[in-house]
Amino acid sequence: MQQQKQLLRVLIAENHQDLSDIMSQLIDTEPDMRCVGQVADASDVLAAARRTEADALILDLMLQGGSGLPLIGELAGALPALRIVVFSGLAFSEDVAREAKRRGAAAFVTKGTDFSVLLNALRQGSRAA
């Protein structure tokens, strides 16, 4: 009997609902991924990651209720297996990307980049890969 490959469970933390919905739909078209939830408020991210048992998180730095940057360390400490991919529309800054990675983000992808770059960042090193 052939073993079924586990789907990569992706949570989206994005304050723009239209973009979040589009990302969710695109993720769900991938054969190895499934969107397990969407949140817009910084205060909901950790609980949603736990509840959905997400393998990977797409994290916008500008969320309702606060910045996503401080969340990175909290998430990395509480859920060390969670792959955090920052997806930000802020003008790319080496300093911001470096700080995000220092706090525990696995990757930093700028909004406007081809979606395949984000998908590849989610896949790299994930526990479901």
Please describe what each predicted stretch is:
Residues 70, 91-109, 113:
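Alpha4 helix (beta4-alpha4-beta5 surface) of REC/receiver domains from two-component response regulators
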Residues 38-56:
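Acidic, metal-coordinating helix/loop segments flanking the phosphotransfer/catalytic sites
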Residues 64:
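The feature encodes the CheY-like receiver
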Residues 41, 67-70:
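Acidic catalytic/metal-coordinating carboxylates
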